[in-house]
Amino acid sequence: MRFLQTYYSFSTDEDPMFDKAGFLSPEFHWITMAISCLLLKQHYGHVTLYCNSTAKKVVEELCIPYDQIVTIPNIMEGYSGYELWALPKLYTYSEQHEPFLHVDCDFLLYDSLPDSFWKADLFAQNIEYDDQLYNRKCIDRFIQVGGKIPNFADIELKNKIISVANAGVLGGNDVKFIQYYTEQAYRFIYNNDRILKLNHDGFINSVYEQLFFCLLYTSD
């Protein structure tokens, strides 16, 4: 089992050390990332980080103790102006050819997971029920501006409340399924390139990363 994290620095600052990454301050961001890494190492021993070269420099300077750092291409340079911040994680998933557990850098796993967890075909943090309709409203907005949703989503979208897999933790033993899932997500992005560039809706990340994972599993 591989234990993975992904961090892609979108920082446009001269010094990416000051990247807040959604936190109140850079200090909170990097401290949380370090604690997340240390907790995974405490439980499972070996943790690999997938990151772009900008992020790698900071991680090495701060001595965050990843056992392996895999430098990924600056894939987001081709998506300037888009809101596809989950795409680097999708890239990490697509590169895996053996069972893995991916944990977000702001997820703190204080306790090791039970043995029964590792027997599952697929892993996710939890199932979320979209009772606030964030995903549905995002999809409705997307369709209204010309976006195309894959056919495999049709049945679930007829339900009053749709379900998504929280990707704070994601992975599994069924790597073949995960490869198929990432292919479908990439195809969605490719087929809707023009719409995604014009429609700056960050909730679309939940659709192609979390909703598709859940839909493809339940429809399989």
Predicted regions and their residues:
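Conserved small/polar residues in nucleotide/adenosyl-binding loops
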Residues: 217-220
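A conserved donor-nucleotide-binding helix/loop in the catalytic core
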Residues: 28-30, 35-36, 75-103, 107-110
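Conserved donor-nucleotide/metal-binding helix-loop-beta segment in metal-dependent transferases, i.e.
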Residues: 112-142
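N-terminal anchoring/stem segment of glycosyltransferases
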Residues: 1-76
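Short active-site alpha-helical segment characteristic of glycosyltransferases
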Residues: 209-213
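Short glycine/proline-enriched coil/turn segments at helix->beta-strand junctions
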Residues: 42-46, 65-66, 95-100, 118-120
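Short, solvent-exposed loop/turn segments at secondary-structure junctions
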Residues: 9-13, 54-57, 76-77, 107-109, ...
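A conserved mid-domain beta-alpha-beta active-site/ligand-binding segment of alpha/beta enzyme cores
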Residues: 149-190
